């Protein structure tokens, strides 16, 4: 039932260059310091702990899957000129893109320091840039936005200081701080501990505990990982915690049972941010394909199943449709659900294989009226006249769009009447974030915010233990979304046209869907 005819489609303008990529690349810091936060004396690091050197090499070289770098994917290490001047035999740091910060020296000067036999190979491993801000701007754009998996800031003191100042600190994802227990002899200091109090809250995600080196005169050390406090995802986790502690235990349609509260969450979409929750991996490809399926007006669950996305299989089964009295529907025909209401509101539903050119096209109307600064920008999936024909009644049922005429930003407020906090809500947050981003692209606006208002926010009883596990995890920074390919029409986008960059979630947590 795809809206293939061009007259029904929504044209997409070419994205302006400033909108296509985040302003700066997210980055991590790797640093070793003594108990007084000293990191060196301007020339050397006054200790040698083989275990911490091995950690530095592995952390900055290996990819997130713990495998070595490849021709298509590696990490970047961003450093000042003095940090670059490690012993000559180590230059450039192998298997990594070396980004050296210098306003005066061209890259040819750095390569000239190397033995002649190393220069040709090193040319592809070394780039030079001004300051950290300029380097992060470079790494946020092609080819580096796709070829670099993680950018690491590795010093020295001036570079660390810039990293903890705006605008760079807003892109900080992680700090790997190795604390070496040794007598203080440094005159260069890393300011993370002091600046974190003044600038942004951080969470200690993990620690190795204090260990004693086997080879460094029995020096002790501790490797700690800090992450900036993710207040937006904390809203989600704190609501789950409140539901499980104070919610009302109720029976529900599925027979599983719920614990519920009647409850708004807000997520920023600025600078390409995508609120894809990090305390468990969210099935991004499923989110993306389902939203595109909605935007095409589809109601045939086979379309998703054929792409190995089975989120609608249970509701489209013969058994479930018959239980809803939809005995005339073909298997996997969900009836006039979300996509049909978005694109054909009020039309008579005749099955997923019929062609439709009637009804109100709410999505196209929103795109067209946004250009006139209209305030009546609503899309609803709740059609009382058609509820009895739907396999499931809409949970996320109303979106309102709003334009900030000063910043040219588009925001969306989603009202969701029924909120499965374990499985559905993480999906819905990402889905309506993507919807807002796509409509912003279609109208030449910047994405602003997603405000998520929850009606009955509930936890299924069979999700409680899994969510307790999730609540023990520390949320990290959200990823960003970049578009690898432009399309002429909104409905023509595919999930492969988009790339999520710097998504480093915890592993998935299995939860059964209540049907």
Curated annotation (Swiss-Prot):
Q: Where is this region: Thymidylate synthase?
A: 233-515
Which domain of life does this protein belong to? Eukaryota
Q: Report the PROSITE patterns cross-referenced here.
A: DHFR_2, THYMIDYLATE_SYNTHASE
The UniProt annotation places substrate binding at 30, 154, 160, 178
One GO CC term on file: mitochondrion
Q: Which InterPro entries match?
A: DHFR-like_dom_sf, DHFR-TS, DHFR_dom, Thymidate_synth/dCMP_Mease, Thymidate_synth/dCMP_Mease_dom, Thymidate_synth/dCMP_Mease_sf, Thymidylate_synthase, Thymidylate_synthase_AS
Q: Which GO terms describe its biological process?
A: dTMP biosynthetic process; methylation; one-carbon metabolic process; tetrahydrofolate biosynthetic process
Q: Which residues bind dUMP?
A: 253, 396, 416-420, 428, 458-460
Active site annotation, chain numbering: 395
Q: Which reaction does it catalyse?
A: (6S)-5,6,7,8-tetrahydrofolate + NADP(+) = 7,8-dihydrofolate + NADPH + H(+); dUMP + (6R)-5,10-methylene-5,6,7,8-tetrahydrofolate = 7,8-dihydrofolate + dTMP
The pathway noted for it is: Cofactor biosynthesis; tetrahydrofolate biosynthesis; 5,6,7,8-tetrahydrofolate from 7,8-dihydrofolate: step 1/1
Q: Which family does it belong to?
A: In the N-terminal section; belongs to the dihydrofolate reductase family.
- Protein name per UniProt: Bifunctional dihydrofolate reductase-thymidylate synthase
Organism in which the protein naturally occurs: Crithidia fasciculata
């Amino acid at each position: 039932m795809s809206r293939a005819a061009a007259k029904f489609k929504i044209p997409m303008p070419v994205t302006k260059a400033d909108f296509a990529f985040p302003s700066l690349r997210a980055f991590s810091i790797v640093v070793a310091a003594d108990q007084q936060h000293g990191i060196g004396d301007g020339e050397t690091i006054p200790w040698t702990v083989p275990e911490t050197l091995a950690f530095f090499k592995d952390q900055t070289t290996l990819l997130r899957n713990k495998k070595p770098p490849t021709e298509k994917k590696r990490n970047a290490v961003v450093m000042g000129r003095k940090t670059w001047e490690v012993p000559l035999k180590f230059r450039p740091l192998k298997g990594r893109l070396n980004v050296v910060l210098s306003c005066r020296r061209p890259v040819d000067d750095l390569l000239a320091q190397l033995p002649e036999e190393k220069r040709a190979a090193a040319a592809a491993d070394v780039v030079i840039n001004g300051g950290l801000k300029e380097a992060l701007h470079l790494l946020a754009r092609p080819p580096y936005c796709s070829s670099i998996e993680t950018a690491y800031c590795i010093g020295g003191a001036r570079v660390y200081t810039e990293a903890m100042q705006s605008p760079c600190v807003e892109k900080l994802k992680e700090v790997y701080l190795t604390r070496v227990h040794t007598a203080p002899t440094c005159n260069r200091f890393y300011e993370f501990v002091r600046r974190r109090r003044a600038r942004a809250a951080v969470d200690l995600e993990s620690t190795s505990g204090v260990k004693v080196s086997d080879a460094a005169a029995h020096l002790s050390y501790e490797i700690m990982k800090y992450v900036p406090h993710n207040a937006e995802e904390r809203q989600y986790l704190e609501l789950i915690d409140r539901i499980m502690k104070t919610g009302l235990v109720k029976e529900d349609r599925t027979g599983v049972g719920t614990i519920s509260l009647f409850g708004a969450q807000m997520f920023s979409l600025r600078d390409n941010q995508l609120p894809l929750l990090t305390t468990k991996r969210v099935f991004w490809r499923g989110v993306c394909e389902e939203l595109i399926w909605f935007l095409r007006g589809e109601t045939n669950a086979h379309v998703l199943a054929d792409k190995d996305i089975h989120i609608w299989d249970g509701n489209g089964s013969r058994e479930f449709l018959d239980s809803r009295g939809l005995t005339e529907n073909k298997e996997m025909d969900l009836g006039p659900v979300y996509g049909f209401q978005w694109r054909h509101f009020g039309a008579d539903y005749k099955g997923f294989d019929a062609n439709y050119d009637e009804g109100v096209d709410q999505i196209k109307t929103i795109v067209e009226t946004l250009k006139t600064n209209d305030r009546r920008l609503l899309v609803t999936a709740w059609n009382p006249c058609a509820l009895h024909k739907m396999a499931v009644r809409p949970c996320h049922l109303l979106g309102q769009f709003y334009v900030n005429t000063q910043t040219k930003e588009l925001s969306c407020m989603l009202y969701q009447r029924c909120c499965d906090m374990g499985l559905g809500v993480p999906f819905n947050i990402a889905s309506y974030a993507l919807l807002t981003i796509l409509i912003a692209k279609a109208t030449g606006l910047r994405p602003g915010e997603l405000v998520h208002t929850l009606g009955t926010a509930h936890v299924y009883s069979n999700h409680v233990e899994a969510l307790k596990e999730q609540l023990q995890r520390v949320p990290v920074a959200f990823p960003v979304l970049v578009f690898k390919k432009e399309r002429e029409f909104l409905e023509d986008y595919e999930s492969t046209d988009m790339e999520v960059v710097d998504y480093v979630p915890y592993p998935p947590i299995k939860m059964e869907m209540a049907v």
